[in-house]
Amino acid sequence: MKNNSIRTVVATGIGAALFIIICIFVNIPIFGNTSIQLQYAVQVLFSVIFGSRSIIGFFMGFIGQVLKDGIQYGDISWAWVLASGITGLVIGLFGKKYDVTMGKFSVMSMIWFNLAQALGLLIAYGVVTPIGDKIQFAQAWSYLYAQSFVAGVANFITIAIGGTLLLAIYASSRTQSGSLTKG
């Protein structure tokens, strides 16, 4: 049990650090303070690999986004912090549907994965970010929903392409269950 706790803390720390670094240095602006964020593909990998402890995906996004906002903007948008965490959490919660640690990532697994990420992003960017930003920044609803929609779509595409590729590569690097036979 203690080993799992250490593994969880280390994975969360490494994941949050990668989240910040990728977010700050690989950033493609598209609308307002919204940009294509490639760190979500890496967050997906951590969320799925440590799916049984999906809290890693949550804290990777949560901590990473807090530090990134603080470093980059000097102000923290708590709705977007929560959205990053929720995205990792939801993807991790459904991780058993697309368990890449066994060396398989079938078309059906890819479909489940993308359905899970769509659900996570719908909650994060369809509900949490517009309402949270309205409370925190009192911006116009039309702007908030436009910004959230653009971010949600950009993140969906990023995760669908980058996340699926990372998971497929990871799965191909694992030994498939039952592929080794006794001689």
Swiss-Prot record:
Main subcellular location: membrane
Topology term for the membrane: Multi-pass membrane protein
InterPro entries referenced in this protein's UniProt entry, alphabetically: ECF_substrate-spec-like, UPF0397
Cellular localisation: Cell membrane
Entry keyword annotation includes Magnesium: no
Gene3D superfamilies xref list: 1.10.1760.20
Keywords: Cell membrane, Membrane, Transmembrane, Transmembrane helix
GO cellular component, one term: plasma membrane
Pfam family, one: ECF-ribofla_trS
Spans through the membrane: 11-31, 44-64, 74-94, 111-131, 149-169
Similarity-based family: Belongs to the UPF0397 family.
NCBIfam families: PRK13661.1
Record PANTHER family: UPF0397 PROTEIN BC_2624-RELATED, UPF0397 PROTEIN SPR0429
Identification of the protein by name: UPF0397 protein stu0306/stu0307
